[in-house]
Structures are given as structure tokens and as C-alpha cells.
């Protein structure tokens, strides 16, 4: 590949040049696996958005007590196998989580906003994006909402759409487990 973004066949004939500058694709090189592949530009930035809500009949204090215990995440979230807190700086918690998908490790930054929200940002690993859990008190109940803006990193990016339904069903199951625990 030369500096103008053209890929030249191994045997240069002067004619066999593909010009990708105006195509909606990117030439990607994976040095670990010695692969050259083409990726549609729309796949590179496509995030899966998942929104799940549930109503909880409980006090805000009790709901916050359960969801803010982030070390207990594997108890409710079946996609999270293990969590390990690495450091705490102010209201930011850095931790390593092991997810159920091929026991992959991801680095997260968690920010707790007491009795309002938990924001988890995936900063390294197979997942990129955020998971935000919000508590909104109403007169009779509390609305708990989880919003994912997520995609798979690297070459796995093309499978983001495939795993969206899997993450959504896991989130629905987790929300029901959390609701059951809070309402006990």
C-alpha cells in the first residue's frame, strides 16, 4: 500500500492499481495475524444501542444499595464472570472484568453518581463503549434503565449486530434478577 491509499498487486504491471480513496471502505492490516482485509467504513463506527427498563417497587436507598455494589456484578450479570478492582481515584474506579465471551478481559472505568447512575466505560479489550444504569424515582416506584452504546473492537467489529440481541437478553435477565433482589 502506498501513501495515497492505493493497494498495488504484488507484481507491478503499472495497470493493476486499485484506488480506494473514494470508496466507502478502509484497508486494514492486522500485523498479529498477517492479514490485509477491507472493511466498510459504516461498520467501523456502528455502535449497538440497547435500552432496557424495569419498574421497581422499593425505596431509592434500597435500590441504590444493591446496584452500587459493583463487586457483586457477576451475581446478576451472567455475561460478567469476574471483576477485579485495580484502582480508585476520586469517584472513578478502574477495574478489570472477565466476560463470558471466550473469557476475554476488558478494562473499565466506573463512575458512581450516588442514587442516580452508574456509568461503565469500556476502555480496553474486546468491547468498546458504555453501559449506563440509571435510577429515576417516581411517586409509586423507581424506574431502573440500562443503556448500552457498545461495539466489538478490531476485526470482531463486524459481529456487533449479531451480539446485540444476546446482550439485550442478558440485560433483561440481569434487570429482572436485580429487581427480584431489591423487592425481597
Q: Positions of the model-derived regions?
A:
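Beta-strand/loop substructures that line and gate deep hydrophobic ligand-binding cavities in soluble
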Residues: 123-173
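Hydrophobic/aromatic beta-strand elements that line small-molecule binding cavities or substrate pockets
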Residues: 54, 106-111, 130-137
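Hydrophobic ligand-binding cavity/cleft-lining segments
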Residues: 39-90
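Glycine-rich portal/gate segments that line the openings of hydrophobic small-molecule binding cavities
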Residues: 74, 84-127, 143, 173-184
Amino acid at each position: 500500500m502506498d501513501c495515497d491509499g492505493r493497494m498495488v498487486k504484488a507484481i507491478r504491471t503499472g495497470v493493476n492499481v486499485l484506488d480506494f480513496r473514494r470508496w466507502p471502505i478502509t484497508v486494514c492490516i492486522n500485523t498479529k495475524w498477517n492479514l490485509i482485509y477491507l472493511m466498510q467504513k459504516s461498520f467501523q463506527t456502528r455502535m449497538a444501542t440497547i435500552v432496557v427498563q424495569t419498574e421497581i417497587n422499593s425505596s431509592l436507598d434500597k435500590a441504590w444499595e444493591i446496584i452500587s455494589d459493583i463487586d457483586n456484578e457477576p451475581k446478576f450479570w451472567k455475561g460478567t464472570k469476574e471483576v477485579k478492582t485495580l484502582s480508585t481515584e476520586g469517584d472513578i474506579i478502574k477495574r478489570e472484568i472477565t466476560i463470558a465471551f471466550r473469557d476475554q478481559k476488558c478494562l473499565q472505568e466506573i463512575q458512581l453518581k450516588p442514587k442516580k447512575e452508574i456509568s461503565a466505560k469500556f476502555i480496553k479489550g474486546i468491547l468498546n463503549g458504555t453501559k449506563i444504569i440509571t435510577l429515576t424515582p417516581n411517586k409509586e416506584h423507581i424506574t431502573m434503565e440500562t443503556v448500552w452504546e457498545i461495539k466489538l473492537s478490531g476485526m470482531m467489529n463486524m459481529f456487533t449486530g449479531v451480539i446485540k440481541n444476546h446482550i439485550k437478553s442478558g440485560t433483561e435477565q440481569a434487570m429482572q434478577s436485580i429487581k427480584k433482589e431489591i423487592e425481597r
